[in-house]
Design a protein with these regions (language model features):
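Short hydrophobic core segments
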Residues: 7, 148-160, 229-230
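An anion/pyrophosphate-binding glycine-rich loop and adjacent beta-alpha core
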Residues: 33-36, 41-42, 51-57, 90, ...
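Glycine-rich active-site loop/strand segments that organize a redox cofactor
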Residues: 47-92
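Glycine-rich loop(s) and the adjacent beta-strand/alpha-helix scaffold that form part
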Residues: 152-196
Length: 288
């Protein structure tokens, strides 16, 4: 009998299991995958963008903003940096407070594994959960590796993004099974893709990136970001688009300012003056 069973050996699951174990609880960590933290492994282009130094409650969408405040005050980006320091993991700030490992994402995975081991967490990898039952004695997990009993259950199975890495709707089904309120899931942090024929006139801009200001939504649901936008062969991407996609609803406009804080008329006049100054005269052309 365990004190806590944690479902999902990703970033949240391992962090939860490690802290619970180090506080003296008997913890088992269960995941259907054979390898730990597949999403950490690919994050940040393989270098793991593990936090943002400026992260605050205003950066999160929630019906209960007080939860974000209490959660972020209870464990800050600086607390995580202190954890990295204890494990001798080097990092750097890439852009606008985004922090990445100097080496690969594997260093973060190994750090979380070590923290779990320090809490004597028991591992059940490659363990399929067929059923979860609850009774007076706690929870019982019927799995491919036998029955697991625990007084408390933590579901940290993540969302449905990137199913090729094993993501499923298991957590949503579990929440509904126990009568928890579930916000209807929809894509977030995604690029915007367009019909190929409609996008064709802009396809030649693929690879061009620039800083923009984006806005969408109204009131509390309004989102505004000053970030980089990237033109792709299928549409728009980059940090600006990934951020605004969490606030956008079908049918709503997205307003894009391609020259934030700049006067385009002045920019064009300056460019014209530069061209006039550098263009060769007809005589220069004839003599050459």
């Amino acid at each position: 009998m365990f004190d806590v069973a944690v479902l999902g050996a990703g970033a949240a699951g391992m962090m939860c299991a490690a802290v619970a174990g180090q506080r003296g609880l008997r913890v088992v960590l269960v995941d259907h995958a054979e390898r730990l933290a597949e999403k950490i492994r690919i994050s940040g282009g393989g270098r793991c963008n593990f936090t943002n130094i400026g992260a605050g409650p205003a950066n999160f969408l929630s019906d209960n903003p007080h939860f974000c405040r209490s959660a972020l005050s209870g464990y800050t980006p600086q607390d995580f940096l202190a954890l990295l320091k204890r494990h001798h993991i080097a990092w750097h700030e890439k852009h606008r407070g985004q922090l990445f490992c100097d080496d690969s994402s594997e260093s973060i995975i190994e750090m979380l594994r070590a923290e779990c081991d320090a809490g004597s967490v028991q591992w059940r990898m490659g363990c399929q959960v067929a059923e979860v039952a609850h009774g007076e004695a706690g929870f019982e997990l019927r799995t491919s590796q036998g029955s697991i009993r625990a007084a408390k259950l933590v579901a940290a199975t993540g969302g449905m993004a990137i199913p090729q890495l094993g993501a499923t709707d298991f957590g949503l089904k579990l929440a509904r099974q126990f009568g928890l309120k579930v916000v209807e899931p929809r894509p977030a942090l995604v690029p915007l893709t367009f019909d190929a024929a409609q996008w064709q006139p802009l396809a030649e801009l693929s690879g061009v990136a620039l800083e923009v200001n984006l806005q969408t939504g109204q009131g509390k649901a309004r989102g505004e970001f000053l970030e980089d936008l990237l033109f792709t062969h299928r549409g728009l991407s980059g940090p600006a688009i990934l951020q605004i996609s969490s606030f956008w609803n079908p049918g709503e406009p997205i307003v894009i300012d391609l020259a934030p804080g700049r006067d385009l008329a002045d920019e064009l006049l300056a460019s014209k003056s530069c061209l006039l100054y550098t263009s060769p005269s007809p005589r220069d052309v004839e003599e050459s």
